[in-house]
Amino acid sequence: MELGYLALVLHAHLPYVHHPEFPDFLEEDWLYEAITETYIPLLRVFENLTNQGVKFRITISLSPPLLSMFKDSLLQQRYLGKIEKLIDLAEREVERTRWLPQFH
């Protein structure tokens, strides 16, 4: 006997924060953090579920400002730059804490 259904509905929105007049704009970090900490991990979960043969359904709504920022080539380039900086920082932190066993 079926007891019911669970509907997952995710809504993604961020305010439009594109500022080409500045090389680095703090509010753009909201987008970069959301991509890194939310959207990419969600896609990985969906991919893993699919690879494991799990049948799932999900509804995702993406706001027009968010979609506009996703497709903006300048924001894409800036995001890649932010990721490169994070990788560099992580590598330097590993080196800095190499001799501290509580960090490894």
Where in the sequence are the language-model features?
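Short, solvent-exposed turn/loop segments enriched in Gly/Ser/Thr/Pro and often Arg
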Residues: 61-66
